[in-house]
Swiss-Prot record:
Ca(2+) 4 binds at residues 139, 141, 143, 145, 150. The gene is CML18. The lineage of its organism: Eukaryota, Viridiplantae, Streptophyta, Embryophyta, Tracheophyta. It comes from Arabidopsis thaliana. Calcium and pH-dependent interaction with NHX1 (increases when pH decreases, better at pH 5.5 than at pH 7.5). Also interacts with the CPB protein At2g18750. This is Probable calcium-binding protein CML18. It comes from the Eukaryota. InterPro entries: Ca-binding_regulatory (IPR051111), EF-hand-dom_pair (IPR011992), EF_Hand_1_Ca_BS (IPR018247), EF_hand_dom (IPR002048).
Length: 165
């Protein structure tokens, strides 16, 4: 979901992106029938760090299921996610600049203290509970800090959540 610093995103997914999507799709297609059930689609989205509610999942399936069979085939899956994958809310340069703003000591990681300080500076003071929740949600490897990849994933998840309601 990375963008080439400042260049506009392409209108279509490239071959490499399609191959990655196909691999992801196949790994969640439990019975290998070429389609995803609601449960399989939910698992796939959660593996990407997203947390769709049941209503969001129902809406996604209704939107994707063009042949009305209650399942999501690969072509339907691509049609569903392609618009969000080809548009990038931030360029790589913007993401790096935002990350550097939060990573006050420049060590490549955002700690809870750095996050709290930066959010307070932005006028969004966090409670201890909010801070813990944000770190826990973004910290994929469990080391207590947020590295750049985890930061990008968190931003991407937030953008997806905003786009999908």
């Amino acid at each position: 979901m990375s963008c080439d610093g400042g260049k506009p995103a392409p209108a279509k997914l490239g071959d490499e992106q399609l191959a990655e999507l196909r691999e992801i799709f196949r790994s969640f297609d439990q019975n290998k029938d070429g389609s995803l059930t609601e449960l399989e689609l939910g698992s796939l989205l959660r593996s990407l760090g997203l947390k769709p509610s049941q209503d969001q999942l129902d809406t996604l399936i209704q939107k994707a299921d063009r042949n009305n069979n209650g399942l999501v085939e690969f072509s339907e899956f691509v049609a569903l996610v392609e618009p969000d994958l080809v548009k990038c809310p931030y360029t790589d340069d913007q993401l790096k600049a935002i990350f550097r703003m939060f990573d006050r000591d420049g060590n490549g990681y955002i700690t809870a203290a750095e996050l709290a300080h930066s959010m307070a500076k932005l006028g969004h003071a966090l409670t201890a509970e909010e801070l813990t929740g944000m770190i826990k949600e973004a910290d994929r490897d469990g080391d207590g800090c947020i590295d750049f990849q985890e930061f990008v994933q968190a931003i991407t998840s937030a953008a997806f959540d905003n786009a999908w309601g």
